[in-house]
Amino acid sequence: MSTIERLDDGRMTDEYTSWIITALITTVAFLLRVWNVGFPNSLVFDETYYPKDAWTMLHQGYEATWPDAAKANADIVRGITNTWTPDAEFVVHPPVGKWLIATGEQLFGFNSFGWRFSSVVFGSLLVLMTIRLARRLSRSTMVGAIAGILLTLDGLAFVMSRIGLLDIFQAFFLVAGVSAVAANRDWFRHRLADHLRTIGNPHLDADFGPALGWRPWRLVAGIMFGLACGTKWNSMFVLATMGIVSVIWDWSARRLAGAGTKAWWSFLRDGVPAFVYLVVVALLTYLATWAKWLVTYPHMVFGKSWAGPAPSPGLSKVVGKPLAALWEYHRQIYDFHTGSYMMTQTHVYASNPSGWLVIQRPLGVDAVNGIKPSQQGCKAVGDTCLRVISATGTPVLWWFAAIAWWLR
């Protein structure tokens, strides 16, 4: 195989067929996830936070407090949805996921279907992105389809696609970001192949090659990673990893094309623009997700002191009071996640991180005891039933897939 042919690897010819297969699997995933998604008609697990935050963001522009969580949850089920106070809630996750939940609530109302609908949509889109990513990496539509089917039926992905939490949105944006980085790899290699055809050489003859500063897929990746970080902070670890991988792929492509020792310049000449596309764009996207907060923070109870004297006078002079207030708020969030409060919290159903990779203890989403016979499907005779919703993934699939990828 020639250098140009190796660089051109990945130009698949079944694009139309692959999209039909992708659409069919994604449709099945959507139908499975949307069926009876309003059950149970109550706020389960951490839905006690995010759907209520989303609802007040629609009406107040920020996350407001609900004075009695248990009473508020019961009231919401009965259709009483306005018992929040003007006081702002101290939230510990960025707003993107909550705005997406709010979209479903705006369309369908503040009910269990409304606050879960966006999760259904993004859980289905996650299947779509997984199919396309697996197809690109494997150069096989069949492998992509298998990946999509497996994710469609994975218990953890399925449950997370049917409750109003943030994780499914984060997962979608991360997979979309990784997919864009992989697309940039192919795009760059194909441009190098086109360049070699244009100059009429089978390789670069130790020349660095074209700069190719415009990288549309890297721009998309930066936006996706910014939205992922705007959902949950730990997305930044994936951003950092894929940034490094992306630059290494550029170096590898130039080396394959015949740049020789000049390929090492890729870490500077391709690396600096990559930093801008991925990190700077992600940061700007992340800041944009806080736009509503920057407008409303002076009206929040915890922000009233910020409406007067600046929280950080020195920083305020440099970036302005709104951004200085946002920085101070981020410092408080970081302290919450890493401080003594979180370190000392306990839970009767807590699981040790060492068991997460094998799901030693499934994630308990909801449990109802004492269901009487002939009610809610209970067929017990002379006894009662227990109904449990658990987010249980497929560790055997995860680990065998990882081993197979390593041995490929």
Which role does the model predict for each range below?
Residues 357-391:
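Juxtamembrane membrane-water interface segments that cap and precede transmembrane helices
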Residues 1-291, 379-408:
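Membrane-integral, polyisoprenol-dependent glycosyltransferases
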Residues 38-75, 282-361:
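Aromatic-rich transmembrane-lumenal/periplasmic boundary elements in polytopic membrane proteins
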